[in-house]
Amino acid sequence: MNNKVHKLSIIGATGRMGQMLVRAAQEKKDFQLVGLLEENGHDLIGTKASELFPSLEKNLVISDSLDKILKISDVVIDFTNPENSVKVAEEAAKYKVVDVIGTTGFSKSQIKKIQNVSKNTTIIRAGNMSLGVNILTGISAKVAEALDSDFDIEIVEMHHNKKVDAPSGTALMLGDSIAKTKGKKLDNLKDIQRDGIIGPRKKGKIGFSVIRGGDIVGNHSVIFAGPGEQIIIKHNATDRMIFARWALKAAKWGMTAEKGEYSMQDVLNLN
């Protein structure tokens, strides 16, 4: 049992997910918040954290120095943007700091950079941190494996109107798990752009549909449509705190893991 109190810093601490992570960390006795990072030029740089989060220590301030924060941290959690998350991963690796990444929308080259620096530290990167979605991922792969090519596969995802990437990292994670059961890469199977007269659906493709609106936290459905029947598996998130709490579980798991890149499937022992 790992009962050590780990020094934790939150990257993008004043953002939507950053604030959730700060609140979730305060629920945990095995983490001590030592750093709250924001980007250079942010209006809140230098602000006492207790002004935003009254229960935090009064000497903790919002910082823009990644270097200073990494020097005092055991682990960082980052839900920001791809470019920033790559930079954080590269710097965290230099300090051997565990890095939990919940950012989505990475390019192939950015993923490669993260994989390369994971040789020097533990990195946990997931398109979705929740238990339910990761179970959905495993179930979807098993269903896909059991069905023949008569079943068309569609993934439908819904998110709030502020989300900037599409399809969501979760939808791509679901598609990737299904593609692997077929011994193929998702890039060769995914069908995203549909507009106009496109002809009949191509056999074996994995279709993606994207919905953006309101304050939807995150809904994902995997549809297996065959002749005369459909199998629909879905997960709805109603509270962002689930992502924060499971990110903290990933952070604790990462403290005893070997160097390398891991997913939530590893953290939850679902592989």
Residue ranges and their predicted role:
Residues L21, V88, I114, V143, ...:
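Aromatic/hydrophobic pocket-lining residues that form π-stacking "cages" and hydrophobic walls in ligand
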Residues S73:
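An anion/phosphate-binding loop that grips the pyrophosphate of nucleotide cofactors and donors
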